[in-house]
Amino acid sequence: KDKMPNTAGSLAMKDSFPLHDAFLVEKLRKSGAIIIGKTNLSEWANFRGMMSVSGWSGNGGLTKNPYDLTRNTCGSSAGSGAAISANLGIFAIGTETNGSIICPSSVNGIVGLKPTVGLVSRSGIIPISVSQDTAGPMTRTVKDAAIALGVLTGVDEKDAHTLASKNIAKTDYTSFLKLDGLKGKRIGYSKKSSGNVKVDFLFQENLKFLEKEGAILVEISEEPVSNEIQGKSFDLMILEYKDGLNNYFKSLGPNAKIKSVEELIVFNKNNPEEMKYFKQEFLEMTQATKGMQDENYAKLLKEIQEGSRKNGIDATLKKYKLDALIAASTSPAWKTDMVNGDNYIFEGSGAAAIAGYPSITVPMGNIDGLPVGILFYAEAWSEGKLINMAYTFEQKNPQRLVPQ
């Protein structure tokens, strides 16, 4: 499939055709990938309104979970998760600011790999946060994720963050597909309850498996990224969102139907079909800011990055001499509720997402027929190590239940 519109699921962008392929799409084509289509997503990557329904967009309607059509797919890469789980393709590209690869991969029973920010170019992708956004592969196996990731990496002059990956990024991650990823590895975990007793029990059972495979489990007493930093990351995203969207609209040329966040807000107000389930508080919040020109932006960015990196994940890994950290990826899929919105219980993806560090989720079991993933995450540029751990876990403890 070629020459498709790029819509973020919005009716405002229904006939919006980019002037160029995204950098990662160019990479895929050059590698011989056959692009068969685009999937639905949570509109505006689940960053339009407070009562949003994951997997719903004005343009595409509601994405349904292949394990139970009344259950949610999570998001924002909702269609990517459902399509790969349902065997409609070998892999899909998801994007994540916080949870949008990991959560839909977990609840749809597949593998999701969120790379370090800067390993994969974002140019051509509709943005939320320049400091957190990334694209990554969503697949049924760790092997497929490793193959796909190697195709996606590369320095792109249109995305300055990719310069940091020079001489670090690999074009082949399959060398990490070995069965020695757990033995002798020090892996940190928290005993703090997820809020779901069945998830806690399943996680504990998988801890026993990790120990059996020779991993050294280390209980950590604090969260790698504090609640304060996690809260402030939302404020940062709101500031970055305005600049990101306005710059994207500008890239579409002078004939673009929507040219600014302000015009997008007006379109939504004038089109009740867009607003029938939830509103657009996040768009209105970002429009009310000065964006990245806000006088507190640089200070806030530094505080969040230091708090999540040097004084967060890096400090935790160093303090406990860890190779990686693990958590349950998220709760099982909830019943879709078009009135009250999403019913998250918890997500394990926040720390790595805010830091811009890599993480990978792999199926660890099922609760009442609904899949749940386990999340491995570590320092920047540690994709190879995480693939090695996840591959060993997957191959020696296969837990993927095929949807019927």
Which sequence ranges carry the predicted segments?
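Short, well-ordered alpha-helical
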Residues: K1-F17, S42-N46, T162-T174, K178, ...
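Gly/Ser-rich, acidic/histidine-flanked active-site/gating loops
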Residues: K1, P5, Q132-T134, H161-N255
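Short helix-loop capping/hinge segments that flank enzyme active sites or metal/cofactor-binding pockets
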Residues: K1-L11, F176-S190, I238-R309, T361-P371
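Glycine-rich, small-residue loops and helix-cap segments
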Residues: K30, I34, G89, E284-Q404
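Solvent-exposed loop/turn segments at secondary-structure junctions
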Residues: K1-D2, P18, I34-I35, L41-W44, ...
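Solvent-exposed, polar/charged alpha-helical surfaces in well-ordered, non-transmembrane soluble domains
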Residues: A22, E26, K30, N65, ...
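Structural helix-boundary/capping segments
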Residues: K30, I34, S85-K191, Q204-F209, ...
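Gly/Ser-rich catalytic/binding loops embedded in alpha/beta enzyme cores
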Residues: K1-N98, T116, R140, G184, ...
